[in-house]
């Protein structure tokens, strides 16, 4: 199974999660700015990762997903966000953003870099769902 993780990160949290997922799946973590060069049709699984700021994900990630929505819809796809919220508030935010992207499998992570270093169990659970 070939996996690509396309992410948008500003403080490194989303990038850390993307790289962790790539290391566990044998996949490739690619910043959205470089993802335009990738042919998504050559991957079995497409994971989209974004950071949340002011209730939304970066515009370039939204544009990327919209431009590739037909290919993403044909793939095993998943979405994650790194956000400041925990619990129900974080889940609701993630649910809303995943619905906007039309991706059913999704998860949210708080403090991605710290999570990867100290307790990646939640990320491992997300990976298992792929």
Labelled PLM ranges:
Residues 3, 9, 13-16, 22-28, ...:
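FMN-binding flavodoxin-like domain, especially the glycine-rich phosphate-binding loop
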Residues 29-36:
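A short glycine-rich beta-strand->turn/loop micro-motif centered on a GG-aromatic cluster
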């Amino acid at each position: 199974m070939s996996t690509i993780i396309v992410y948008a990160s500003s403080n490194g949290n989303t990038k850390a999660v993307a790289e962790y997922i790539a290391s566990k799946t044998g996949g490739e973590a690619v910043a959205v700015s470089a993802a335009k060069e990738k042919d998504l049709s050559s991957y079995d699984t497409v994971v989209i990762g974004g950071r949340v700021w002011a209730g939304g994900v970066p515009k370039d990630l939204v544009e990327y997903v919209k431009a590739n929505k037909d290919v993403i819809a044909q793939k095993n796809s998943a979405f994650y966000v790194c956000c400041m919220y925990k619990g129900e508030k974080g889940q609701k935010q993630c649910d809303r953003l995943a619905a906007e992207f039309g991706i059913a499998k999704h998860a949210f992570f708080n403090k991605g870099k710290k999570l990867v270093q100290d307790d990646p169990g939640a990320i491992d659970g997300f990976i298992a769902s792929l």
